Amino acid sequence: MEKQVDILIIGAGISGIGLAVHLSKKCPQRKFEILERRDSFGGTWDLFRYPGIRSDSDMSTFGFNFKPWAKDKVLASGAEIKGYLSDVISENQLKDKIHFGHRVLSANYDSTKKKWLVEIEDNNKKKQIWSANFVMGCT
């Protein structure tokens, strides 16, 4: 099955989620989807869960301009950042745009079609080819 999108975002961490929000607000006519290899969003903030993990950057600069950090503590823990990203996903209706358990096997530009052809494998080992005008690596 081939799925077609304008923009394919690879990665549902802070960069991929931020890009998705900006696209939905500034380019609502563009169709985009997010591929995430793991079973959850958050990237680093989901992957690493050791005691004491936190951002070394204050959240007033690390957070998004469209959703200012509202807590008093400016150096957020990993769990707090993951919660912040969860709020961003909910508030911007991004949940249905994220495809968890989808791994990119290859991405090749077809100059005849003027499209990226991206081979994807899901957790069930089912392979698909998606086409996109743009592929944004947010990993």
Stretches with model-predicted labels:
Residues 2-5, 131-133:
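Active-site acidic short loop of glycosyltransferases
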Residues 3-34:
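N-terminal Rossmann-like FAD-binding beta1-loop-alpha1 element of flavoenzymes
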Residues 15, 39-40, 105:
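Short, solvent-exposed loop/turn segments at secondary-structure junctions
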Residues 34-43, 131, 137-139:
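Carboxylate/His-rich catalytic cores and anion/metal-binding grooves
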Residues 37-87:
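Glycine-rich active-site loop/strand segments that organize a redox cofactor
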Residues 71-139:
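Feature captures the FAD/FMN-dependent oxidoreductase FAD-binding
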